[in-house]
From Swiss-Prot:
It comes from the Eukaryota. The gene is rpl22. This is Large ribosomal subunit protein uL22c. Belongs to the universal ribosomal protein uL22 family. One of its GO terms (molecular function) is rRNA binding. It comes from Barbarea verna (Land cress). The lineage of its organism: Eukaryota, Viridiplantae, Streptophyta, Embryophyta, Tracheophyta. Pfam families: Ribosomal_L22.
Amino acid sequence: MIKNRKKKSYTSVYALGQYISMSAHKARRVIDQIRGRSYEEALMILELMPYRGCYPIFKLVYSAAANASHNKGFKETNLVISKAEVNQGNTVKKLKPRARGRSYPIKRSTCHITIVLEDISFYQQYEEYFMYLKKPGCSNENRNLTCYDTYSSGGLWDKK
């Protein structure tokens, strides 16, 4: 079996919340509102939304930002929620006692939530560097364009 190895990302951090006692459908309703937004904007949205699922997601986003600042030294103003996903967890089954010795089953659904934050300051520096290289007066001998030359000349792409 071939395993997909994750590449080590230097610009992203994540926080994972497992077995949160909430329906995955209800958590997705909140997660869809904050996906793709900045860290500060997401916190503001989560504080003002009137759903019960906002508080555990708020804690996860806050934890991911703490991981970013403590482990990798990122600034919180540059963080963006790049990926937020909700997966269904186990269903906890209980029995509720009823009258005359009977019992009714109760199902508590759980979910797993993953929040990934990315630091966009690296991308801005990268774009500034490319803009510098594209200037007409800039001559950089270390620039390697072999992949573009191979693609434009045909090379491997002409053969089938």
